[in-house]
């Protein structure tokens, strides 16, 4: 789960991280009130969307010379003018795609005198089962661009959760960023604060870009992005309360209500599969036959008829879907339950696109019999390759 920048900074501030003062604003009036509280002399008006590249982004409906989604201004009146221009508009960045995202809230923050910019992040390293710390002197840029152009400027080290942060880690961070004296001590303190927050809140990623050195020689978190492990949210009602559903795909929100693992993609063939590995294999073979998957959807090992029906309805709600492939290997999951769910869903929502069903495993013959006797126009497949080939042919033939 992702949260907005202003929320991320509030979370980090709880652990003592140095963040600039600022206030969220949902209206122009709230933006003005925030600026008046801050007092100036410099304000930063930031669009709050779940995407990077806001500063270089462009608002739809404004000219090519218009300012982006992060604006530095020097008066309360300028805050008012820019807030009025930004709120309610769609901001397009390199991460949003051409559709962009509507700006429904702003963050009005005090300006900072910047001497240097750094990059700092904490990530879960699944290979080593440790927390990976990534640091670079090239802050304020996309880390992917830095990795491509100057990989030698990216430094990383791992922290073992069994032992936590040691002085050696602090020295490694200071060396990576070229910090000495008081700034090196501040970096050591900050690393401890960030690591504690990372573990305490079950984060999947903590990214600060940029982490700055101010002109009076102090570290400050100028921008922050936090992502949380969705499977651990039950332990953090405070974090769960920060969820902004307007930033998420409605289909993914609906899927979460049924504990379905659903991720929307850009293809034309909807997939309903049980098991993450089989789901990925299904997506791969669809691509092998020349089409693109419209989603990743894992119904899990113990899905009920109602859960399968919900999954089918979520897939068909995507207007980009031109065909559906159901691929089930019944171990814990029974094929007859899948068949009943598919039939119930088709009868409820109707079937406007080709549907191929491949069943194998527990009660497979009963499942096939249920589908065969349903009277619905469902194409049966013998195996995964056969199913992928049939759905791709059906979709391309209907095009």
From Swiss-Prot:
Assigned GO CC terms: cytosol; succinate-CoA ligase complex
Binding site for Mg(2+): 209, 223
Subunit structure: Heterotetramer of two alpha and two beta subunits.
Pathway per the UniProt entry: Carbohydrate metabolism; tricarboxylic acid cycle; succinate from succinyl-CoA (ligase route): step 1/1
SUPFAM superfamilies the UniProt entry points to: Glutathione synthetase ATP-binding domain-like (SSF56059), Succinyl-CoA synthetase domains (SSF52210)
Lineage: Bacteria, Pseudomonadati, Pseudomonadota, Alphaproteobacteria, Caulobacterales
Protein name listed in UniProt: Succinate--CoA ligase [ADP-forming] subunit beta
GO molecular function, one term: succinate-CoA ligase (GDP-forming) activity
E.C. designation(s): 6.2.1.5
PANTHER family to which the protein is assigned, alphabetical: SUCCINATE--COA LIGASE [GDP-FORMING] SUBUNIT BETA, MITOCHONDRIAL (PTHR11815:SF10), SUCCINYL-COA SYNTHETASE BETA CHAIN (PTHR11815)
Gene3D superfamilies the UniProt entry points to: ATP-grasp fold, A domain, ATP-grasp fold, B domain, Succinyl-CoA synthetase domains
Binding site for substrate: 274, 331-333
Superkingdom, natural source: Bacteria
Organism name: Caulobacter sp. (strain K31)
One BP annotation, GO: succinyl-CoA metabolic process
């Amino acid at each position: 789960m992702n949260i907005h920048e202003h929320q991320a900074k509030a979370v980090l501030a709880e652990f003592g991280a140095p963040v600039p003062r600022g206030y969220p604003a949902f209206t122009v009036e709230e933006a003005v009130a925030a600026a008046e509280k801050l007092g100036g002399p410099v304000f930063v008006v930031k669009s709050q969307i779940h995407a990077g590249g806001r500063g270089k982004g462009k608002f739809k409906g404004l000219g090519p010379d218009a300012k982006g989604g992060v604006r530095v201004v020097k008066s309360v009146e300028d805050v008012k003018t820019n807030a009025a221009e930004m709120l309610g508009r769609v901001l397009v960045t390199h991460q949003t795609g051409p559709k962009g995202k509507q700006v429904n809230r702003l963050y009005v923050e005090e300006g900072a005198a910047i001497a240097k910019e750094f990059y700092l992040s904490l990530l879960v390293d699944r290979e080593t089962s440790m927390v990976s710390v990534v640091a670079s002197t090239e802050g304020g840029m996309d880390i992917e661009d830095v990795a491509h152009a100057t990989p030698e400027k990216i430094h990383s080290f791992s922290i073992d959760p069994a032992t936590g942060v040691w002085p050696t880690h602090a020295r490694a961070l200071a060396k990576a960023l070229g910090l000495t004296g008081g700034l090196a001590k501040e970096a050591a303190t900050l690393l401890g604060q960030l690591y504690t927050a990372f573990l305490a809140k079950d984060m999947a990623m903590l990214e600060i870009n940029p982490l700055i050195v101010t002109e009076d020689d102090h570290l400050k978190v100028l921008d922050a992005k936090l992502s949380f492990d969705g499977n651990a949210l039950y332990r953090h009602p405070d974090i769960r309360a920060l969820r902004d559903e307007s930033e998420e795909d409605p289909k993914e929100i609906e899927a979460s209500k049924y504990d379905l693992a659903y991720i929307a993609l850009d293809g034309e063939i909807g997939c309903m599969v049980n098991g993450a590995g089989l789901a990925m294999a299904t997506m791969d073979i669809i691509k092998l036959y020349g089409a693109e998957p419209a989603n990743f959807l894992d119904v899990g090992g113990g899905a009920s008829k109602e859960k399968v029906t919900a999954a089918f309805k979520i897939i068909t709600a995507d207007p980009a879907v031109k065909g559906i492939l159901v691929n089930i290997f019944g171990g814990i999951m029974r094929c007859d339950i899948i068949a009943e769910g598919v039939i119930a869903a088709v009868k409820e929502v109707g079937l406007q696109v080709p549907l191929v069903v491949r069943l194998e495993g527990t009660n497979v013959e009963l499942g096939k019999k249920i589908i065969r006797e349903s009277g619905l126009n469902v194409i049966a497949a013998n195996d995964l390759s056969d199913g992928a080939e049939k759905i791709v042919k059906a979709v391309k033939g209907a095009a």
